[in-house]
């Protein structure tokens, strides 16, 4: 049985917390203004109609309505189809 831990065993044993990224509201779901739609690193999804983009590239709803995913110019976009008031 070894009485020393070994060269690298004391330098291991670390892990970072998950960042909880991804789509939070899917196509067809109804949302209110300010709700987070997508958490992402970089612009995998781009903001479309009634959607804003935060400093960390998070997409959020600017108006109440239903979520719609689509493409425009080869980019994936997220739109909010506003509810008729």
Swiss-Prot record:
Iron in keyword set: no
Pfam families, per database record: Ribosomal_L27
Keywords, in A-Z order: Ribonucleoprotein, Ribosomal protein
GO cellular component: cytosolic large ribosomal subunit
Region (Disordered) location: 1-22
SUPFAM superfamilies given in the database record: Ribosomal L27 protein-like
GO biological process, one term: translation
Regions of compositional bias (Polar residues) in chain numbering: 7-19
Family matches, as InterPro entries: Ribosomal_bL27, Ribosomal_bL27_CS
UniProt GO molecular function: structural constituent of ribosome
Family, per entry: Belongs to the bacterial ribosomal protein bL27 family.
The protein's name in its UniProt record: Large ribosomal subunit protein bL27
């Amino acid at each position: 049985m070894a009485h020393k831990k070994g060269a690298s065993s004391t330098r291991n044993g670390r892990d970072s917390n998950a960042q909880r990224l991804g789509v939070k509201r899917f196509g067809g779901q109804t949302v209110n203004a300010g709700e987070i739609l997508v958490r992402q690193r970089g612009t995998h999804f781009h903001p479309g109609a009634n959607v804003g983009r935060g400093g960390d590239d998070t997409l959020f709803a600017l108006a109440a309505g239903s979520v719609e995913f689509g493409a425009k110019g080869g980019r994936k976009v997220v739109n909010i189809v506003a509810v008729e008031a």
